[in-house]
Structures are given as C-alpha cells and as structure tokens.
C-alpha cells in the first residue's frame, strides 16, 4: 500500500484579516443594499485571516486577465519548485526517484502545464508521467491523491510528486456586487503545497488502504466558473450546502468495507474545509463530535478555503498532532460536479 508523506505547505507573504476584508468591501461598496447581510454571512465563515499573492489594494483595481495571468505564472513557478524540493526531501527520496508528477490548480492557466516546469526545474527524469488537473476545483487535491495511488499500485517504484497551487485572490472581481461574490472574496485564500506519495512501505504517514470516487448527478450548477473578459467569476448555488447527506453513506460504506467500523469510530479525519456549513454537515451526517474535525476548522480559520491545497494542509497538521501508529483515518474532499473523492487508511508515522 502507498503512503502519503509529510507535505510542505507555503503561503504568500501578504496577509489579510477578516475585519480588514470587511472594511475593504464596505469602502468599495458603501451603498450596497445588502452589505449588512454580507457582513453577517462573512462572520459566519469562521475565517480569521488569509494569505494573498498581492496586497488587497492592488487586487481592488482589476488590471485585466492578462496581468493576473502573468502574476499567476510568476508565483506558480517560484513557489511550486521550492515546495516540491522540500516534499521530496520529507519523503526520504531523491529527485530521480519520482516517476509521476501531478499538479492541481483551478485559479489560473498555463500551457505547457506547470508539470513541464517542474520536470525542467527539478531535473526530474525525462520519463516522468505528467497529470495536470485544472477543472476539479476544491476536490482536486483528493483526486490527485487517488490517481497517484492508482499509479503507485502498479509498481512499488512508482513514487508520485503532487503539487497543489491555488491563488484564488487572482480571481477576485472587485466590481462584482453579487452577494455570493462578497462571500467568496472573504472565504478563499492562497497557498501552495507539495506532497509525495511513496509506492512502497518505507516511510511513515497516511498509508492508503482503499479509495472511492462519487459524482452527484445533475449537480453541475452547484459550483462553477463563469468565464468572462475579466477572468474567472466563481458562482456557488446554496444547494451545495446540503450535498453532504448524499455522499455521507458512500463514506460510511468505504470505511466499513475497509475497517469494519463506522466513521464515528475512526481516530482522525482529513476533510476539505469547504466552509463552516460543510464541516457542520460532515459532523452531523457522520455522527461525529464537533472537535473531531478540529484540524480542518483550524485550517479554515487560519488560511481560509485554500481549495485543492486544503487536504495537504490538514494532513500536515495531523503530522504535527499526537496520532499513534495504527490509527485509522478518512480523507475526503468535495468540489465541482458535484464530485467527492475519498480515501481511508492507517497512520504509520
């Protein structure tokens, strides 16, 4: 069975508190008739601070999709390479040991993919398999883990480098006055992570036993982008907040088939931080105590929703916690489609 090793997570230098973001929105849209409601909804996100690739004052003046794409590529190249080198070292491997590289990102576009940059910059083997994932949004990190696991199961030498990179602030639309635009502007944060999935049993971490994918039919409108001249405009249907009830039975079945116990008896969880409501729904439908998802809540509070990076940030927090060898855990993330990707396994660190 393959093992997720200690990730390396990086944040851009610019930081913004939630109060600063509220003040910014109030100044920008002083006469908005629903600003009081927006402020209450932003307070309910339970996000305290986030990191941004540019200061909020620069983001408040939309300089065009071209300029934002230049910033995206510049920061992506620099931060991804640094994170990747540290992740490979964390896994106890050499660069030449990597046989596949996966990059997840839904907040910018590059062609060739960032996978090509990493092969060149790190001097990965020329036979390295590339898998860029661009349109799975927040679920992409977990999807990358599961696709890496599929590849690793073919050969005990098939070690995989996964790099997740999200600069959601570059999708901020200061002229968008829709209520959900205000909420997303205060919810999503910027971050980069790199993590190695080792195909052998020679490292400690989250050893994957079984994975599962789930697609909710006729839910494409739940989470989507409207692509306009100014770039990506994020839209969210409130129906997504009730989607966990559909995927919870799938998680329970996966868990029981793997360990003959319900999720409530697991020792740890690595959940995507879609927002406070999503975490509350997981607690309710999996019959968990609220503190069982404390690592995800901490990630949400300290970094915001960092999309495909979330599962790796929460995984890193589990490495810093007091888990014991043999503890059983569930990893799950959710995104456009509506899509869920899940993995269950044991702690071996």
From Swiss-Prot:
The active site is at 138. The keyword Acetylation does not apply. Belongs to the thiolase-like superfamily. Chalcone/stilbene synthases family. Keywords: Acyltransferase, Antibiotic biosynthesis, Transferase. Changing residue 24 to L: Shows reduced activity toward lauroyl-CoA and decrease in phloroglucinol production. It is an enzyme of class 2 (transferase). The keyword Acetylation does not apply. Pathway: Antibiotic biosynthesis. Pfam families: Chal_sti_synt_C (PF02797), Chal_sti_synt_N (PF00195). It catalyses: 3 malonyl-CoA + 3 H(+) = 1,3,5-trihydroxybenzene + 3 CO2 + 3 CoA. GO terms for cellular component: type III polyketide synthase complex. Type III polyketide synthase that catalyzes the synthesis of phloroglucinol from three molecules of malonyl-CoA. In addition to its ability to produce phloroglucinol from malonyl-CoA, it exhibits broad substrate specificity, accepting C4-C12 aliphatic acyl-CoAs and phenylacetyl-CoA as the starters to form C6-polyoxoalkylated alpha-pyrones from sequential condensation with malonyl-CoA. Phloroglucinol is widely used in industry and in the synthesis of pharmaceuticals. PhlD can be used to produce this chemical, however it exhibits low productivity, which is a bottleneck for large-scale application. Different stategies have been developed to improve the stability and the productivity of the enzyme. This is Phloroglucinol synthase. It comes from Pseudomonas fluorescens (strain ATCC BAA-477 / NRRL B-23932 / Pf-5). GO terms for molecular function: acyltransferase activity, transferring groups other than amino-acyl groups. GO terms for biological process: antibiotic biosynthetic process; polyketide biosynthetic process. The gene is phlD. It comes from the Bacteria.
């Amino acid at each position: 069975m393959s093992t997720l090793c200690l990730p390396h997570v990086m944040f851009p230098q610019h930081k913004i508190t939630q109060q600063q973001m509220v003040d910014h929105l109030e100044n920008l849209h002083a006469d908005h008739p629903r600003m009081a409601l927006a402020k209450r909804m932003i307070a309910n996100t339970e996000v305290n601070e986030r990191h941004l690739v540019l200061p909020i004052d620069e983001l408040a003046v939309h300089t065009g999709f071209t300029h934002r794409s230049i910033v995206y590529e510049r920061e992506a190249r620099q931060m991804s390479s640094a994170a990747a080198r540290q992740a490979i070292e964390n896994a106890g491997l050499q660069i030449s040991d990597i046989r596949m590289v996966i990059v997840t990102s839904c907040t910018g576009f590059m062609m060739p993919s960032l996978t090509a940059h990493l092969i060149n910059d790190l001097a990965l083997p020329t036979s390295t398999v590339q898998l860029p994932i661009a349109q799975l949004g927040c679920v992409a990190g977990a999807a990358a883990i599961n696709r890496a696991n599929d590849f690793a199961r073919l050969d005990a030498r098939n070690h995989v480098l996964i790099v997740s990179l999200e600069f959601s602030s570059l999708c901020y639309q200061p002229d968008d006055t829709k209520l959900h635009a205000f909420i997303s502007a205060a919810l999503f944060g910027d971050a980069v992570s790199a993590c190695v999935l080792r195909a052998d049993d020679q490292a400690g971490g989250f050893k994957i036993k079984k994975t599962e994918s789930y697609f909710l039919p006729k839910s494409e409108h739940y989470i989507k982008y409207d692509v306009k001249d100014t770039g990506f405009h994020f839209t969210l249907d409130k129906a997504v907040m009730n989607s966990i009830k559909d995927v919870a039975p799938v998680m329970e079945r996966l868990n029981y088939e793997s360990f003959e116990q319900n999720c409530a008896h697991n020792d740890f969880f690595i959940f995507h931080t879609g927002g406070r409501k999503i975490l509350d729904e997981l607690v309710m439908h999996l019959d968990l105590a609220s503190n069982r998802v404390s690592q995800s809540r901490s990630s949400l509070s300290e970094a915001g929703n960092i999309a495909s990076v979330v599962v790796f940030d929460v995984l890193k927090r589990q490495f810093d916690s007091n888990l014991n060898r043999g503890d059983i855990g569930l990893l799950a993330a959710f995104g456009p489609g509506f899509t869920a990707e899940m993995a269950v396994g044991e702690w071996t660190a």
